[in-house]
């Protein structure tokens, strides 16, 4: 049986990748990821069946987060590291199994494999299509993808020292439920919304972790040009990795630039003390093939999004860490205290040319909830006076599809009395357009990374309170969200849990939504796709 994966927005034909992932993963990697996920579901089943307290599982919780993170789109393409993780998690599962009644356990809790060949054979029977009913399958996958996004955010918070036992408990509960054939469509819909509830909790946890460690994001002008020093490019999302690299590059003559979703690191006060933290290089993740060539220096991937490099020269400059991985790229492990030695990257940087300049100027961001609340009086007055007619939440992800030019055109054609609220790499479609300001309020307010969509929800709820409204949907806020991978799924489910309706989701609706599940989302929540820029703006402004 060939691979089957439809977890990302770019899945082939909007239906599923069956030969090779559009992301670049091959059949073997896809199947190993399926088996790793199934193994984690087996652990979740044992935890749930045995009423095991997640608070007592310590490192097992961390390995579960890492395993789930490894299966997110564009995180890990390294078949060897995924196989190693499967073996590790099977050992964890088998040890845990000793504490529960052995009879009648689900296959996920008892299956065994002893070779790569047997792993791939087993994966054939446990992938997405092993659930026959398409509506049950659709809901199970939506919950699973939401949990993957939740695990990514929980791992980042854990790396900063913030954990929540309730989030671990829910991850086990939700994944175990995807193995339970007694659950109905209604049961799974309820669990989908509960996944959104825990999505809000995990984003709040990560927000607390980031701000307690690095300070509250503040309005910041970020340089997009270059200097003449050798440099390292940091991509992904993990701020603790960036912090360690900046500490280790102090005084070395090596500059550090952010890439993609790491851009918002510049907004945190703690990172402003590093004089070699120069700026942001390039654009959204999918443009990296060309931009990595012109950067010249080493690239450190702390998480997704990795695009398979097309040349050996670039591959030799790519390093991975955490849950990320790519064959042939050096992986930097943490020691038992979470410390990482980046000296090899730094020494390589010293031997390579400085980056080529691909653009000049600066961009402004740092509009997370604390900063926007500090401007609340100005924002409220702008709404009351009519200077600002509407806010557009255009958070989410960017991607390769040509149809994503819609978001650039949408931003360009919005009436001048509207403001865009954004988070995630979707911002790159319009954050360099120079859309101006309204009475000193920039027309693009960037809150940060994809998880900082939490900030946008906090801002909306605060505005609801300020204006004395009983429903978030009565605010002059429209949601036009771009999605790509599983972290966007947990953000979407969180918004649905908070009661947000009439979200437009694009550039295409998820391939994992069955017609019946999509129908319920449309009828109950008003979820819609995108149309033409002109028609959508008319609809939103009416």
From Swiss-Prot:
Transmembrane segments: none annotated. GO terms for molecular function: 4 iron, 4 sulfur cluster binding; hydroxylamine reductase activity; metal ion binding; peroxidase activity. Disulfide bonds: none annotated. Its main location: cytoplasm. Its cofactor is [4Fe-4S] cluster; hybrid [4Fe-2O-2S] cluster. GO terms for biological process: response to hydrogen peroxide. It is an enzyme of class 1 (oxidoreductase). It holds the Pfam family Prismane. Binds 1 [4Fe-4S] cluster. Hybrid [4Fe-2O-2S] cluster binds at residues 237, 261, 305, 397, 425, 450, 485, 487. It comes from the Bacteria. Keywords: 4Fe-4S, Cytoplasm, Iron, Iron-sulfur, Metal-binding, Oxidoreductase. The modification Cysteine persulfide is found at residue 397. One of its GO terms (cellular component) is cytoplasm. [4Fe-4S] cluster binds at residues 5, 8, 17, 23. Its EC number is 1.7.99.1. InterPro entries: HCP/CODH, Hydroxylam_reduct, Prismane-like_a/b-sand, Prismane-like_sf, Prismane_a-bundle. It catalyses: A + NH4(+) + H2O = hydroxylamine + AH2 + H(+). It is found in: Cytoplasm. Catalyzes the reduction of hydroxylamine to form NH(3) and H(2)O. Belongs to the HCP family. NCBIfam families: hybrid_clust, PRK05290.1. This is Hydroxylamine reductase. It comes from Acetivibrio thermocellus (strain ATCC 27405 / DSM 1237 / JCM 9322 / NBRC 103400 / NCIMB 10682 / NRRL B-4536 / VPI 7372) (Clostridium thermocellum).
């Amino acid at each position: 049986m060939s691979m089957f994966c439809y977890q990302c927005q770019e899945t082939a034909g909007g239906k599923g990748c069956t030969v090779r992932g559009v992301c670049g993963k091959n059949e073997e990697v896809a199947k190993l990821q399926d088996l790793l996920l199934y193994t984690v579901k087996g652990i979740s089943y044992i935890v749930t069946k045995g009423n095991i307290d997640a608070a007592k599982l310590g490192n097992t919780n961390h390995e579960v987060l890492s395993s789930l993170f490894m299966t997110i789109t564009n995180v890990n393409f390294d078949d060897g590291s995924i196989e190693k993780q499967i073996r590790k998690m099977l050992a964890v599962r088998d040890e845990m199994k000793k504490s529960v009644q052995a009879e009648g356990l689900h296959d996920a809790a008892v299956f065994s494999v002893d070779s790569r060949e047997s792993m791939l054979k087993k994966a054939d029977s446990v992938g997405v299509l092993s659930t026959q009913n398409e509506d049950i399958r659709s809901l199970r996958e939506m919950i699973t993808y939401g949990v993957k996004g939740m695990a990514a955010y929980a791992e980042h918070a854990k790396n900063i020292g913030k954990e929540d036992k309730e989030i671990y408990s829910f991850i086990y509960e939700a994944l175990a439920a995807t193995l339970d054939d007694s659950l109905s469509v209604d049961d799974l819909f309820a669990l989908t919304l509960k996944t959104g509830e825990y999505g809000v909790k995990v984003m709040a946890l990560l927000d607390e972790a980031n701000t307690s460690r690095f300070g509250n994001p503040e309005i910041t002008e970020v340089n997009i040009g270059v200097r003449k020093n050798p440099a390292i490019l940091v991509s992904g999302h993990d701020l603790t990795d960036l912090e360690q690299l900046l500490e280790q590059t102090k005084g070395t003559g090596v500059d550090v630039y952010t890439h993609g979703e790491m851009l918002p690191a510049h907004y945190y006060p703690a990172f402003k003390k590093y004089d070699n933290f120069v700026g942001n290089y390039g654009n959204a993740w999918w443009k990296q093939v060309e931009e990595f060539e012109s950067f010249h220096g080493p690239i450190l991937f702390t998480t997704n999004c990795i695009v398979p490099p097309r040349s050996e020269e670039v591959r030799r400059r790519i390093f991975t860490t955490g849950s990320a991985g790519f064959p042939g790229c050096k992986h930097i492990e943490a020691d038992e205290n979470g410390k990482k030695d980046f000296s090899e990257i730094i020494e390589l940087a010293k031997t390579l040319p400085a980056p080529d300049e691909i653009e000049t100027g600066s961009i402004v961001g740092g509009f997370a909830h604390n900063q926007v609340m500090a401007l609340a009086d100005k924002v409220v007055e702008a709404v009351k006076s009519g200077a600002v007619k509407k806010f557009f939440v255009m958070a989410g992800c960017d991607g390769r599809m040509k149809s994503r030019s819609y978001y650039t055109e949408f931003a360009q054609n919005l009436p001048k009395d509207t403001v865009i609220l954004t988070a995630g790499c979707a911002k790159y479609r319009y954050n360099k357009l120079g859309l101006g300001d309204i009475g000193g309020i920039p027309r693009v307010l960037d809150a940060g990374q994809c998880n900082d969509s939490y900030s946008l929800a906090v801002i909306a709820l605060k505005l609801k309170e300020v204006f004395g409204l009983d429903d978030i949907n009565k605010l002059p806020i429209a949601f036009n969200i771009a999605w790509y991978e599983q972290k966007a799924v947990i953000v979407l489910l969180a918004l649905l849990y908070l009661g947000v309706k009439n979200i437009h989701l694009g550039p295409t609706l998820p391939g994992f939504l069955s017609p019946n599940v999509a129908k319920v989302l449309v009828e109950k929540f008003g979820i819609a796709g995108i149309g033409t820029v002109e028609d959508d703006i008319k609809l939103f402004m009416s």
